[in-house]
Amino acid sequence: MVKRGDKVRIKRKESYWYGDVGTVASVDKAGILYPVIVRFNTVNYNGLSGSAGGINTNNFAESELEVIS
């Protein structure tokens, strides 16, 4: 089970961050499909051209994460 602050590697192949390492920001206990919010140091491609905007968090299921030490 992952917990807040864990470093995790992303295993969801269709994710922009596949293979990258992020930090668990929170884990929702409400029984939703993707309860783990992971924060990354980089942003994705959603920013406008030439701007630093974009998203640096995403939700994942625990089965899509590998805890690293």
Swiss-Prot record:
Membrane topology: Peripheral membrane protein
Subcellular location as annotated: Cellular thylakoid membrane
InterPro entries listed in its UniProt record: Elect_transpt_acc-like_dom_sf, PSI_PsaE
SUPFAM superfamilies for this protein: Electron transport accessory proteins (SSF50090)
One Gene Ontology term from the biological process aspect of the record: photosynthesis
One of the record's GO cellular component terms: photosystem I reaction center
Alphabetically ordered keywords of this record: Membrane, Photosynthesis, Photosystem I, Thylakoid
Pfam families on file: PSI_PsaE
NCBIfam families in alphabetical order: PRK02749.1
Function: Stabilizes the interaction between PsaC and the PSI core, assists the docking of the ferredoxin to PSI and interacts with ferredoxin-NADP oxidoreductase.
Similarity-based family: Belongs to the PsaE family.
Name of the protein this chain belongs to: Photosystem I reaction center subunit IV
Taxonomic lineage: Bacteria, Bacillati, Cyanobacteriota, Cyanophyceae, Oscillatoriophycideae
